[in-house]
Amino acid sequence: MIKLGIVMDPIAHINIKKDTSFAMLLEAQRRGYELHYMEMADLYLINGEARARTRTLSVEQNYDKWYEFGSEQEIKLADLDVILMRKDPPFDTEFIYATYILERAEEEGTLIVNKPQSLRDCNEKLYTAWFADLTPETLVTRNKAQLKAFWEKHGDIIMKPLDGMGGASIFRVKEGDPNIGVIAETLTELGNRYCMAQNYLPAIKDGDKRVLVVDGEPVPYCLARIPQGGETRGNLAAGGRGEPRPLSESDWEIARRVGPTLKAKGLIFVGLDIIGDRLTEINVTSPTCVREIEAEYPISITGMLMDAIEARLAK
């Protein structure tokens, strides 16, 4: 029997209709895995050995009672076959410390999804720089004058912090906007933090597409998140409307280009953000949108994931 651990935000507070981690747990349970639940505070190191307080878990698709804890135990993380790291951002120093603990378990043979070192290496906004021919025009800087010059060149740009999620603190700055200076100062904290600027992509009106990649293989359907009511942002957390659809030709091209690199880095479950035919983000920490896609199309993305995990464990 496969022992699967999950590190996640409190399960009592999730929305099971939308929660991808919950979908993963349902599929793992369907396959007869033993489920071990952990939150960040449950992980610890003692003399270099990664350990945790875990609670065995059962889940069900029931809006009144979707989980039940069984026994509680202190275990070596190496006793688990696989651990899903599904803690949502912020990707802060605490998150990084947790990846070091998980890496100790990985060195003792536990499969970690996604690979701890790659979680640290691949910032969701910055990692697109390794595929620069696929992205919009992009500037990463702390320098207000550089941001202003980039804006003057393109006339209509998007500016965002490097550590946001769910569309937080994303600004669209159009030609002639008198606020460019204060937006640059705010995002860079007066030149003390890096931020990103990209040329505005009009294709956002047709949706910001979340394309999932499982162990290097693109999922054939994506979720287009369409901005509502004059918004620039399609993120569901910012009120965007989700519309599942098949991948376009350019979606396939991008996912097939990026996929092998993700697989080689141990990034087994990844969400690409694509606007039109441009790659804007590579989400590695806790990608979502599985439930929305699975509700519309006859596909089990969590099944693809568990197949990939089983294949890796069999090696």
UniProtKB/Swiss-Prot annotation:
Protein name: Glutathione synthetase
UniProt: ATP binding residues: 151-207
Gene name in the database record: gshB
HAMAP family referenced in this protein's UniProt entry, alphabetically: GSH_S (MF_00162)
NCBIfam families xrefs: glut_syn, PRK05246.1
Reactions it catalyzes: gamma-L-glutamyl-L-cysteine + glycine + ATP = glutathione + ADP + phosphate + H(+)
Cofactor: Mg(2+); Mn(2+)
Recorded family membership: Belongs to the prokaryotic GSH synthase family.
